[in-house]
């Protein structure tokens, strides 16, 4: 996998990771990590015949930072500028968690650029927003503690499964990859942008635009409720896949994740249509 940092016309730096040849598939990662955390899954996707382009989001990885108070739409503007720089004007978009919320934003506002959307435990759906909504500052500490407890449960569940599926050498490689992918505390700005977001009208826009969509969601997700995945799929008329895992099941079993993404895309439409992306 090739890792590089490109500089946009406005001077903003963006970390870009690429692997494979074929239909372009843009992958957007989850909160607090970077594209590198998903390297095993992305490499497997390339083996399925995709040209994978994984971007470090603003405030993450090797990418620059946006000012405090920015929105998710601001983050997607950086994404689209980067793809313009790479001469990618239409692609399959897949995103996990925060990245899934960004895919929803792009698909709703720029449907001509999205050949298909694959949402992996995406930060989308009314149940998700109800779970993290900004406000009621008197209870903020309690809500923060509650979410932290859920996140710990989720991470432990996926982490145990990830270690269970790997041999000793693979375990060391996996832990090193996660360590290298963590983005410090800059991601807090992006977290606040997610708390202010409202994807429900965007999901309806995706449906109106006829964006082919697949939703893959962990049955035991403690961060984005399973019900949010169901409602996201219902609004967008998406194919839905329930996965026996937590919020980051694709890190625990990257081979399964890549195979499911490929299966979902083949289920949405013929391969000859997918290869028309770009």
UniProtKB/Swiss-Prot annotation:
The active site is at residues 97, 221. It holds the Pfam family Abhydrolase_1. Residues 24-240 form the AB hydrolase-1 domain. Coiled coil: none annotated. Its EC number is 1.11.1.-. GO terms for molecular function: peroxidase activity. The keyword Oxidoreductase applies. Keywords: Oxidoreductase, Peroxidase. It is an enzyme of class 1 (oxidoreductase). The keyword Oxidoreductase applies. Belongs to the AB hydrolase superfamily. This is Putative non-heme haloperoxidase. The lineage of its organism: Viruses, Duplodnaviria, Heunggongvirae, Uroviricota, Caudoviricetes. The gene is 59.2.
């Amino acid at each position: 996998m090739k890792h590089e940092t490109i500089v946009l016309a406005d001077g903003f730096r963006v970390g870009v990771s690429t692997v494979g040849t074929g239909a372009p598939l843009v992958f957007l990662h989850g909160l607090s990590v970077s594209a590198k955390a998903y390297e095993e899954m992305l490499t497997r996707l390339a083996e399925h015949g995709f040209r994978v382009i994984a971007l470090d989001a603003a405030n993450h990885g090797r990418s620059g930072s946006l000012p405090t108070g920015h929105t998710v739409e601001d983050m997607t503007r950086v994404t689209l500028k980067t793809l313009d720089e790479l001469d990618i004007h239409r692609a399959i978009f897949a995103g996990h968690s925060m990245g899934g919320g960004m895919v929803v934003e792009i698909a709703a506002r720029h449907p001509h650029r999205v050949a298909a959307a694959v949402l992996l435990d995406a930060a989308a759906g009314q149940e998700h927003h109800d779970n993290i909504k900004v406000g009621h500052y008197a209870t903020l500490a309690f809500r923060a503690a509650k979410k932290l407890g859920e996140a710990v449960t989720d991470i432990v569940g996926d982490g145990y499964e990830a270690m269970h599926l790997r041999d000793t050498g693979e375990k060391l490689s996996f832990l090193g990859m996660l360590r290298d992918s963590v983005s410090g505390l800059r991601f807090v700005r992006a977290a606040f942008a997610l708390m202010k977001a409202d994807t429900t009208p965007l999901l309806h826009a995706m449906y109106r635009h006829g964006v082919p969509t697949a939703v893959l969601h962990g049955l035991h997700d403690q961060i984005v409720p399973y019900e949010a995945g169901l409602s996201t799929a219902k609004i967008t008329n998406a194919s839905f896949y329930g996965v026996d895992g937590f919020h980051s099941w694709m890190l625990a079993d990257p081979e399964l994740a890549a195979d499911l993404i490929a299966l979902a895309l083949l289920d949405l439409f013929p391969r000859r249509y997918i290869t028309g992306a770009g």
